[in-house]
Amino acid sequence: MTKQKLLLNGTFSLILIVACEAQQLPRSHAASSSGPLCEKEAESWGNLLSSERLDAWICSLIGSFMVGLSGIFPLLVIPFETGAALRSEAGSRRLKQLLSFAIGGLLGNVFLHLLPEAWAYTCSAAAGEGQSFQQQKLLGLWVIIGFLTFLALEKIFLEKEEEECPGVGCDYKAPLGKIPNGSGYPPSKVAGKSQRAEKNSTQCNGSSLQSCRTDNRIKISGYLNLLANTIDNFTHGLAVAASFLVSRKVGFLTTMAILLHEIPHEVGDFAILLRAGFDRWSAAKMQLSTALGGIVGACFAICAQSPKGAGETVAWILPFTSGGFLYIALVNVVPDLLEEKNPWNSLQQILLLCTGITVMVLLAHN
């Protein structure tokens, strides 16, 4: 899984490098073609490092880092067990309740925050009605591209996981793949599978059962969620920096609004990481690492030297991220909830899902 994590991080870094190079290419070409343009380029760099810009740099980086720190907030509010406790009846029920809230938060984040913001930009940037309609169709296309990208990534890495431990002689693999229902696994079935697993522990492709269990301990859905969060934090960094470019007051208000929106969202993301196999501290550290996306986004917005330049980037990143969040919520998390057989637990999960959406509605109106 380390190679997979490095590949995901490398992919995102490559996207950022290409985006930065694409923005700097026209400037460098103009600078090499004539002397006056070269002087304008030097003047623009001087403006970038002026005292006003320096204030925007400092405030934007601090604001983006504060937004990233919200990733460790779930440690303060979720006294959640890990390891074997997740496979118990009570632990499974609590995890599914958190996952229900996470689905509501993700759906509310997509349809009440990300897509409306991208829609508002396309409407304001369009010159005519025909152009506005074309940009709105492009917005929907980016949502589909984001969904399919996350589908392709999971298919690629899922095949590699199955090759590492195909399960020949590993009877214990079946119960490891899913969270038990609210009623728990029947004790006799679990005991029987455990005995067969011990008997065949040395027959899993020449390696022990413990090594197979370790290889599949972290699900790819956890890394996909981290990738989506990194891109989401990149857009937050763009918004924070663009606001500080307008004024310090607007920047502080924007930072506070994003923080209020991120807290319930991070709680849901934390539950998804626990479901993927991370322990509490590893999940918090991985959530904190996504703050780098916000810092990169803030630097990108300030180097664009205008809120409009940041807005053009947001116009396609927001719907792309929305597609990724939709994939995580509907494909990776919802199937676990559909396995619930207890009617009372199912009702609780639906109520918590609605609670997550309600929280996002309240934050969207503030």
Curated annotation (Swiss-Prot):
UniProt-listed Pfam families: Zip
User: GO CC annotation: what is one?
Assistant: cytoplasmic vesicle membrane
Cite the GO molecular-function annotations of the record.
zinc ion transmembrane transporter activity
Q: Where is this motif: XEXPHE-motif?
A: 261-266
Q: Which reaction does it catalyse?
A: Zn(2+)(in) = Zn(2+)(out)
User: Where is it localised?
Assistant: Golgi apparatus membrane; Cytoplasmic vesicle membrane; Endoplasmic reticulum membrane
- Identify the residue ranges that face the Cytoplasmic compartment according to the record: 27-57, 119-137, 247-282, 335-343
Q: Which residues lie on this side of the membrane: Lumenal?
A: 1-5, 79-97, 159-225, 304-313, 365-366
User: According to Swiss-Prot or TrEMBL, what is its membrane topology?
Assistant: Multi-pass membrane protein
TM ranges? 6-26, 58-78, 98-118, 138-158, 226-246, 283-303, 314-334, 344-364
Q: Cite the residue spans of the region called Disordered.
A: 183-205
Keyword terms of this UniProt record: Cytoplasmic vesicle, Endoplasmic reticulum, Golgi apparatus, Ion transport, Membrane, Transmembrane, Transmembrane helix, Transport, Zinc, Zinc transport
Mention one GO biological process in which this protein takes part, according to its record: zinc ion transmembrane transport
Free-text function comment from the UniProt entry: Functions as a zinc transporter transporting Zn(2+) from the Golgi apparatus to the cytosol and thus influences the zinc level at least in areas of the cytosol.
PANTHER family in the cross-refs:
ZINC TRANSPORTER SLC39A7 HISTIDINE-RICH MEMBRANE PROTEIN KE4, ZINC TRANSPORTER ZIP13
Homology family: Belongs to the ZIP transporter (TC 2.A.5) family.
**Known partners and oligomeric status:** Homodimer.
Name recorded for this polypeptide: Zinc transporter ZIP13
Task: List the taxonomic lineage.
Answer: Eukaryota, Metazoa, Chordata, Craniata, Vertebrata
Gene name of the encoded protein: SLC39A13
